[in-house]
Amino acid sequence: MNGSSRTTRGAVFGSAGLLVGVALLSGCGSGDEGGSKDSDKAGSSDSAQAQSPAEAVQATNEKTTQAETAKIAMTVTTSGGQAQGKKVTGDGVMDLQDGTSKLTLDQGPNTIEQRVVDQVLYQKLPKKAAEQLPDGKTWMKVDLGELQTRGGGNKGLNDPAGSLAYTKSLSEKNVEKLGTEKVGGTKTTHYRVRLDLAKMAKGDAAQQKKLREQLGDEVPMELWIDDKGMTRRQEIELQVQPSGAEGGKKQKVKTVVELSDFGTEVDVQPPPSGKTADMTDQAAKGAKQSS
């Protein structure tokens, strides 16, 4: 049983690192309902260029989610402690409005199929790890909404129903324009953003304190936004406390997410319930131990 807990808990928090990048690009429709695809297409590159850096970053939330869906590619690199040099890559599709997604994740010889449906994370583990699941199950699941309720999730960071809505409250001093670059053949403007943890906590002092303990005083993020105002690449770097390493050295987790093929079809279903083991309790306990 202890071996099973360690194995599945590790899988959960491996996925949590990946969800950091995904979450910041998903569920953006939860804030504002305004806008349409037609109004997005009507936006010109001239109007985008006329915006200040802060205005461009604040507007990308609505512009990107108006596309509804996209293909996604991501890379998560961990450094520090025993995780030094670990790298996970993934690609798949995502609904940008509600966070529904399907990804194939690769770490060395191991491949994990990951789905998020209705704020529930599902992972089909590699064969050796799946042997540790109870009753011969092949999929594990974690209810991310329940995890957040129980203190195992960061609002706006690893909840796929969260959003980029915090960008609307950024001031000019939080955003720096770095220049222009091509991402996947598309011309973009590169911005550096520093997230304000006080604003992310939305006035919740306890949540702000927890965010600072987990992430530090500042969270650096970089965005590449195209001439239509849509996010093409996002890079975020976090200092996180690894599970089971209380008092140990924090690890640096760098997540890079790229979006392309906006409007692509996204059809994701949860795996059969008979093949799924609910690991939400283990994930919540592991999160509390690492907080």
Locate the predicted segments by residue.
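Sec-dependent N-terminal signal peptides
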Residues: 8-20
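A generic, residue-level signal for flexible/boundary positions that often mark functional hotspots
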Residues: 19-22, 253
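C-terminal motif of bacterial Sec signal peptides marking the signal peptidase cleavage site
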Residues: 24-27
